Amino acid sequence: MALINFDLLAELPVAYQAFAPTVDVLPLIPLFFFLLVFVWQAAVGFR
């Protein structure tokens, strides 16, 4: 039975550590699109 060390998966490799702040923000991008739908509909009057 193979045991997976999830701490290893949760950490970026050393070569990508510079991108850590960007990776932290990436999951929020779909939420911005979701909110943009409501802003757009409010702008056009919820047609």
Swiss-Prot record:
Entry membrane topology: Single-pass membrane protein
Pfam families: PsbK
Subcellular location: Cellular thylakoid membrane
Domain of life from the UniProt record: Bacteria
TM annotation in the entry: 26-46
Subunit organization: PSII is composed of 1 copy each of membrane proteins PsbA, PsbB, PsbC, PsbD, PsbE, PsbF, PsbH, PsbI, PsbJ, PsbK, PsbL, PsbM, PsbT, PsbX, PsbY, Psb30/Ycf12, peripheral proteins PsbO, CyanoQ (PsbQ), PsbU, PsbV and a large number of cofactors. It forms dimeric complexes.
Protein name: Photosystem II reaction center protein K
GN (gene name): psbK
